[in-house]
């Protein structure tokens, strides 16, 4: 990293990567795919995705022991994790559903995006993109995150 440090622009707000590319300050950026998709699909921007090597995150829905309104919470969890609910968010933002059956529903319903365009080219977890992706390891980060963050912060300050 030392060899490229002077050429890196760090950002702390999700809108910043696209602003940096648009302004010409940088030629490429790491950005949230939902923001890139919104810029392309809703604002007509001319960005392109580079999916190779993307890092997919795992998200969890849990119900803790002794939670109040357990039955209602469980009903919501079942609803939220259904293929239909997972697919529905893609009508408005190209975040991939956590279930492959949700991707199947989107694909079968194209054009799926609320503006009437195809959303599948903007989805991060199509089968072909999964082949060139890596999945983050939450256990590794739990075990090593504090040390890595400390080392990275020290490097940033050097």
Label the model's feature ranges.
Residues 1-2, 18, 22, 30, ...:
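Non-transmembrane alpha-helical segments in soluble domains
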Residues 1-4, 43-67, 111-112:
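Periplasmic-binding protein-like
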Residues 1-50:
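Ligand-binding pocket segment of bilobal, Venus flytrap-like solute-binding proteins
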Residues 4-8, 25, 40-43, 80-84, ...:
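Sec/Tat-exported extracytoplasmic proteins
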Residues 9-13, 28, 55, 64-69, ...:
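Extracytoplasmic/periplasmic, Sec-exported soluble proteins
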Residues 55, 64-130:
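Mature extracytoplasmic/periplasmic domains
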Residues 62-64, 75, 135-140:
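Active-site rim elements
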Residues 125-158:
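Conserved C-terminal helix/tail region of periplasmic/extracytoplasmic solute-binding proteins
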């Amino acid at each position: 990293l030392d060899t490229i440090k002077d050429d890196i622009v760090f950002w702390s707000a999700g809108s910043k990567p696209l602003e940096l590319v648009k302004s010409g300050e940088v030629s490429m950026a790491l950005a949230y795919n939902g923001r890139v998709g919104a810029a392309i699909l809703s604002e007509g921007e001319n960005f392109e995705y580079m999916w190779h090597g993307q890092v997919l995150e795992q998200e969890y829905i849990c119900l803790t022991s002794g939670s109040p309104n357990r039955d209602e919470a469980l009903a919501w969890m079942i609803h939220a994790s259904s293929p239909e609910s997972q697919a529905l968010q893609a009508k408005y933002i190209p975040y991939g559903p956590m279930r492959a059956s949700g991707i199947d529903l989107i694909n079968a319903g194209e054009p799926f995006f609320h503006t009437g365009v195809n959303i599948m080219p903007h989805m991060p977890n199509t089968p072909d993109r999964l082949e060139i992706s890596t999945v983050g390891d939450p256990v590794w980060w739990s075990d090593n995150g504090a040390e890595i963050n400390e080392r990275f912060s020290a490097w940033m300050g050097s």
